[in-house]
């Protein structure tokens, strides 16, 4: 086994590895390979921590790191770092390679003076590399209430005392949202790879219509593209044959959805009034793809 810095001749192979590693894991298809492709030219990218793992001369794993920041409660910006995607070829998963690659990368990061990392992931895996809930360090996740314990948001202080007793909020760097911000570029890039079937399946992250917020739990819930294929971003009530069924603003969509608050309340631990539901949606909708720029 060998771990080394990625070089340009590895790029396509590593992007294909990343695509294979993430396909249909967290969502139908994946975008992580496009994130990696675009991140290499970002000022946040850290070339010294762009690492590949080889086994018998074959690249079987990869990880990249990025600069990030935390907004402290006084409004100032505190330097931190994040990492990912971290990819292991499907044939080598669950054999300890991912943890070996990560621990090696963390040691290199510490040697470079990187004091604090935060990321989204499964604590059952990442705790073996020293990560714990970020809320224990008073680091809040931008998309969740500041007083909540977010089970997937993790952090680790690599240099003792670097973070200290500070408190602040973390938002992932913009580079991780490039597929949402450049959908046409992503589709063109994705078309350069062999076609693979996208599947909506149990175990993935919860999927929501990126326009109305409706949960997407099965293929039949989803909209359709102009060629008749499934569109996993939008529901059948919002998107059909490659177009939105009607134009509206975000506020108009929230007003429309609020009519169904009684149905929503069947899934809620505590019933919401119509006004409470609308207030909640004003926090949620700006994170949806259709409204992200407006938000």
At which residue positions do the language-model features occur?
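A short, internal acetyl-CoA/4′-phosphopantetheine-binding micro-motif in the GNAT/acyltransferase core
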Residues: 85-93
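Short linker/helix segments within small regulatory modules
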Residues: 222-232
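Glycine-rich phosphate/pyrophosphate-binding loop shared by adenosine-nucleotide-utilizing enzymes
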Residues: 1, 58-62, 81
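Conserved acetyl-CoA pyrophosphate-binding loop and the N-cap/start of the following alpha-helix
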Residues: 92, 96-104, 114
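Short cysteine-rich clusters marking metal-coordination/redox-active sites
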Residues: 209-212, 235
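Active-site rim helix/loop that mediates acceptor-substrate recognition in acyltransferases
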Residues: 15, 22, 26-64, 69
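Conserved active-site alpha-helix within GNAT-family acetyltransferase domains
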Residues: 111-114, 121-147
